[in-house]
Regions:
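Subtilisin-like serine protease catalytic core
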Residues: 236-270, 275-330, 363-365, 384, ...
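Extended low-complexity, serine/threonine- and proline-enriched intrinsically disordered segments
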Residues: 8-50, 140-144, 151-168, 657-706
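Catalytic-core environment of secreted peptidases
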Residues: 253-272, 447-461, 468-541, 558
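Autoinhibitory propeptides
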Residues: 1-13, 25-138, 158-238
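C-terminal edge strands of extracellular/lumenal beta-sandwich accessory domains
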Residues: 677-690, 718-776
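Substrate-binding/access-modulating region of protease and related hydrolase catalytic domains
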Residues: 155, 318-438, 528-535, 539-541
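Secreted peptidase-domain scaffold signal
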Residues: 594-678, 682
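Structured lumen-facing ectodomains of secretory-pathway proteins
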Residues: 209-211, 393-493, 497-503
Length: 776
């Protein structure tokens, strides 16, 4: 059911107190109401994202809310009446058993009201903080129920304007977008009005037109540092540029353009004129991210970007000198304007990658797609540009059971298990930060790793080894159980303060010292030679964007590929993931978490996605590792077959063989539909007897996003005839009716261990003649 024309009075809230899985099954058996959220018609299992699972992975009781739209007012009133009868009597007349089964799982059934409008994670706390801190005017963002009718949108906006002015406030800005079905207004009102909203008495909080009320100016994925991080360091970098047209854009804070690590390497585009009031000392996040994007970790710098970096400031500093989205700007509107300018202006239309190291701590992903994520999804498909987005930071104390003495006495493996189980138990409060749930973007989590030299601990402890998931990184998964984050990369080692009394509670507090290692060394204000050591998923994201720019140049040099320009971003996305595997990280993490079966796969992918990318594996072939790349467009209900020729040297050969296949694409979206992802592409290898065992990620979860990455292995000696191929069938399944042609890139690598000394490359090269067979 498309809900773009929702009548606000038709939205029901179901508070679940029983089994979520049982509730979903019972709800599906009753006609007349539909999900607002993500239930998209595919078979579901209990999901630990909105249901607690016991040690066996089974659904157990947890209070949760779901939102439904009734098909008509009469049905709505009947359902409310039945709920009241059930509450009063606990039983029904004959024929109403399905309702009894449904109600047995519920704590409450009611209309959408003022409770729900402030019910998103952390919103109430942030508004309370604003109401206390501000003595005069407070800005809040009101998100309205979207209507496909422009007349209804205007009427709803007028009603909010009237109520705002009656409360002594004023309208600051408004934004409507039909493509993502979003309608929002920023108002300025008194702190007293905000307090009345929190109490549920303000007319604005009771208005049927309102879906959500939120604080403004929140979005930034803050780096983990102290306030006086900078130290001086002189660097001598190669300043030669191969090309001036940018491949990568950075949407972030204003950078320190005259820093020695950034000088003559940036194109700063500031159409809003924010630079004038952006003090040099406050230009922290943008300077650090630009530094990482251009040079990587300065502890062991990479070859710098060969093209200029385009920078568009989307942050300003507030009165407390914090970098954030301005409180008078609707962030979705700012994103839309910034990306449209990048992709349509001559100076930056060469951009293929947009780095977005941001995360809204008041928008944790639970079920529904945030408007920011919807905007990224729409923009990526419309402009064929890859957004690389940080998963989000959750830097918090570790409240571990027992005393510090008992924790300290344990072996490191036991300490790791305690820490990761503690973080996993708090998963609900550590999920992705918007817009990281975007299905088209590449979402990056962080590993506890950097290139810093061994450092003096100086009252700090490092309880986990390098290249394990960082304790601050957000935990996935994504929309409709897709793999999120997509991958992980070095984000910097975060240490904790030593506890000097063994009898004290084992509460590990973060060390925010940034003037010395560990951490990634970055350019930092206020001076042209200042540096700092920082940590965060922002850092990991910037490093992956650097790798993406490197891959653009690699792809351009592949002979005979003939990749259309509108497929470059999709190819980069696929190649970044193609080199990923769980490896030792996955093994150690699973030992810490102690999960098994499908829960093992899901838990690991929620932490590290498909793993850490190894660019060396994808940038070139060897005699024992051969990568083939295919591309094209596909439409609904179509199949395309790619032939991967098998070398004769593997015929009846007993050795470990690995086949890695990655399919990447961008999907158009149904922004307010239970089937959000319109293009459901997938691949299936046929005739793959030599590597018939799936490894790592769950084979169902990999099909729920816009990148399917699978690893197949085998050791058996399998006979086959000369000229045999593995058929890789790419299909586009039917979701909702879809008229768009979907561009995609398919990457396949067959390999054996180098010591096998088999001539895979030569034999495949001799046979290669990529042919595609189209089936409709």
């Amino acid at each position: 059911m498309n809900v773009d024309g929702i009548v606000p009075e038709s939205v029901l809230v179901f508070e679940v107190a029983g089994s979520v899985d049982s509730f979903i099954k019972a709800a599906k058996k009753i006609e007349g109401f539909e999900w607002i959220g993500e239930l998209d018609g595919e078979d579901k299992e209990p999901d630990e994202d909105f249901a607690n699972l016991d040690s066996k992975g089974q659904d157990k009781k947890y209070n949760e809310k779901f939102y439904f739209v009734m098909s008509n007012q009469r049905a709505l009133q009947q359902l409310l009446s039945l709920w009241q009868i059930y509450c009063d009597k606990g039983q029904f007349d004959f024929g109403l058993a399905p309702f009894r089964t449904l109600f047995e799982q519920l704590k409450d059934v009611r209309l959408w009201n003022e409770i729900d409008r402030l019910d998103e994670y952390g919103v109430r706390d942030k508004l309370e903080e604003l109401a206390i801190k501000e003595t005069s005017a407070v800005k809040v963002q009101i998100e309205l129920w979207f209507s496909s009718s422009s007349e209804k949108r205007s009427a709803r906006e007028l009603q909010i304007r009237i109520l705002t002015e009656q409360a002594g406030g004023r309208i600051i800005s408004t934004y409507q977008n039909v493509d993502i079905q979003f309608h929002a207004i920023i108002i300025e009102c008194s702190a007293a009005t905000v307090k009345q909203m929190l109490e549920g008495s303000a007319p604005l909080i009771k208005a049927n037109e309102v879906q959500w009320i939120r604080p403004t100016g929140q979005v930034i994925d803050k780096v983990i540092s102290d306030e006086n991080a900078e130290i001086e360091r002189i660097f001598d970098y190669d300043t030669n540029l191969i090309e001036t047209s940018p491949l990568v854009a950075l949407l972030d804070g204003m950078p320190l353009e005259n820093h020695t690590m950034l000088r003559d390497r940036l194109i700063v585009d500031d159409p809003d004129g924010w630079e004038e009031n952006y003090l040099a000392a406050d230009r922290k996040h943008g300077t650090a991210m630009a530094s990482l994007l251009i040079h990587g970790d300065a502890n062991a710098p990479w070859s710098p970007l060969t093209s200029r970096l385009y920078v568009r400031p989307i942050f300003r500093t507030n009165i407390e000198h914090e970098e954030c989205v301005p409180d008078d700007v609707i962030f979705v509107d700012l994103l839309h304007r910034a990306v449209k300018r990048i992709m349509e202006e001559d100076v930056s239309k060469t951009v293929k990658i947009i780095n977005l190291s941001v995360g809204d701590s008041s928008r944790l992903f639970l079920h529904s797609m945030s408007p920011e994520a919807r905007m990224l999804d729409w923009l990526s498909f419309h402009y064929k540009v890859l957004f690389i987005v940080s998963a989000g930071n959750h830097p918090s104390f570790l409240y571990l059971n027992g005393t510090y003495g008992s924790f300290k006495e344990k072996a490191q493996k036991e300490q790791m298990s305690i820490i990761y189980k503690h973080l996993q138990a708090d998963k609900r409060n550590r999920t992705l930060l918007a817009p990281a749930e975007s299905v088209n973007c590449l979402t990056v989590g962080a590993l506890h790793a950097d290139m810093s030299n061994p450092c003096v601990m100086d009252g700090r402890i490092n309880p986990i080894p390098s290249l394990m998931p960082a304790t601050y990184t957000a935990i996935g998964g994504g929309y409709d159980r897709s793999i999120k984050p997509d991958l992980v990369y070095r984000g910097g080692k975060l240490l904790y303060n030593e506890i000097y009394a063994d009898s004290m509670d084992a509460t590990l507090r973060i060390s925010k010292i940034s003037s010395r290692a560990p951490g990634q060394m970055v350019a930092y204000p206020p001076n042209p030679t200042s540096i700092a050591y920082l940590k965060g998923t922002s850092n990991a994201t910037a490093l992956v964007s650097h790798l993406g720019a490197y891959l653009v140049n690699i792809i351009r040099e592949i002979p005979l590929l003939e990749l259309p320009d509108n497929l470059m971003a999709i190819a980069v996305k696929g190649m970044l993931v193609h080199g990923c595997s769980w490896g030792e990280i996955g093994e150690k993490l699973n030992e810490c978490l102690g999960t098994n079966g499908r829960m093992k796969k899901r838990s690991i992918s929620n932490w590290i996605g498909y793993g850490m990318p190894d660019i060396e594996r994808v940038k070139e072939c060897t005699q024992q590792r051969v990568t083939l790349i295919g591309h094209g467009t596909i439409r609904q209900n179509q199949e395309v077959v790619f032939d991967y020729p098998l070398p004769q040297c593997l015929q009846s050969k007993t050795c470990k063989k690995r086949l890695t296949i990655t399919l990447s694409w961008f999907t158009p979206i149904n922004p307010s539909n239970k089937i959000y992802r319109k293009a459901r592409l997938s691949f299936s290898p046929k005739g793959n007897e030599i590597t018939d065992q799936r490894q790592e990620a769950d084979n169902n979860a990999v099909k729920h996003g816009t990148i399917q990455h699978e690893i197949f292995e085998g050791k058996k000696a399998i006979p086959y005839l000369e000229g045999k191929n593995i058929e890789i069938v790419v299909s586009c399944g039917k979701e909702e009716s879809m008229s768009e042609n979907i561009p995609y890139v398919l990457i396949a690598t067959l390999e054996v261990a180098p010591e096998e000394n088999l001539p895979l490359y030569n034999q495949i090269k001799d046979r290669i003649e990529i042919q595609t067979h189209i089936r409709v």
